[in-house]
């Protein structure tokens, strides 16, 4: 499994993927953040937060949304008055959060497809980029359909991730560095360790790993020459 460098909630917040008047949604993504991320939001400037998140890509790939995101951040810092008359700002928003995550979420290597890229090719490419293992060392298990993780995000929209089951030799060597900009840590874990490390509210992800575990215990894996 891999651990993201930044929590999903933090990335959504810095990118300004919300309406400042949708308090409940903003509260939901704040509750997904780590304690360190919450502290940084209160103590650092938006420019510092933006540069830290995107690194060398800060002025290129997401330039179009930077100013919009900054305006929302400053609006909340100065205070927002809801239509109900209730007011809040960044400080009250963070202080009302009841979560205390120490690390960002753990999950599986995945990502978006490139233009005209097939699902399977995307899966192999993302695995190589995010783990450092050569994708050619992977052996796909062909007679198992992809596992689909369908879930409702904090924005109440439906999303679907598709995972392909593959395996590699025990003595496979990780030759390349994984994407440090997106991946903070990586571990080979047992089924129990996976279940323990996945956040409790990520029920769909827990269901995926349980289904994989059941498949591996109920069926024999055979090499086909």
Task: Cite the ranges covered by each PLM segment.
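Internal, charge-rich low-complexity segments
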Residues: 1-80
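Unchanged
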Residues: 8-9, 53-56, 61-216, 220-225
């Amino acid at each position: 499994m891999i651990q993201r460098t930044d929590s999903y909630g933090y990335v959504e917040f810095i990118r300004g993927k919300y309406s400042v008047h949708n308090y409940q949604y903003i509260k939901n993504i704040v509750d997904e953040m780590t304690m360190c991320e919450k502290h940084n939001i209160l103590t650092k400037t938006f420019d510092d937060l933006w540069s830290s998140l995107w690194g060398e890509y800060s002025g290129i790939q997401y330039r179009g949304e930077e100013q919009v995101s900054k305006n929302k951040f400053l609006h909340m810092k100065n205070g927002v008055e809801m239509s109900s008359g209730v007011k809040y700002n960044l400080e009250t928003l963070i202080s009302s959060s009841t979560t205390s995550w120490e690390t960002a979420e753990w999950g599986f290597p995945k990502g978006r497809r490139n233009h005209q890229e097939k699902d399977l090719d995307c899966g192999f490419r993302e695995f190589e980029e995010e783990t450092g293992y050569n994708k050619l060392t992977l052996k796909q298990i062909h007679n198992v359909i992809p596992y689909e993780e369908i879930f409702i995000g904090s924005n109440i929209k439906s999303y679907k991730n598709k995972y392909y089951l593959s395996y590699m030799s025990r003595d496979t060597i990780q030759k390349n560095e994984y994407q440090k900009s997106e991946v903070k840590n990586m571990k080979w874990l047992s089924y129990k360790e996976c279940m323990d490390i996945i956040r409790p509210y990520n029920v769909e992800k827990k269901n995926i790993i349980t289904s994989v575990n059941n498949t591996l215990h109920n069926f024999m894996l055979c090499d086909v020459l």
